[in-house]
């Protein structure tokens, strides 16, 4: 794994436990960090349990107001933000994309979708991800 990939994983591990109980991690990052998939995933995909998707204030606190953030999408069902924490790779600037969806809110609230809390991070079960 390249150094910039290790740095990306470290920043994701720093962010996830501080977002709180309202979010459930899904996708490639969940598979990489919590299920041992040997494949690099470079963004964070979350589902919101309550429907509150705007995490800018939490990110400002985590980044100690040093990160630049750019909202790319803000609708009733999706919130997407790019977090520039100073990372670069072979191609230049390398911001972190965080996307939150509220489309599965009712399924999460009614416990139809299975997830568990691992070290302070809600993560979908492997069956739900696959």
Question: What spans do the regions from the language model cover?
Answer:
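Compositionally biased terminal segments of proteins
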Residues: 1-26, 30-130
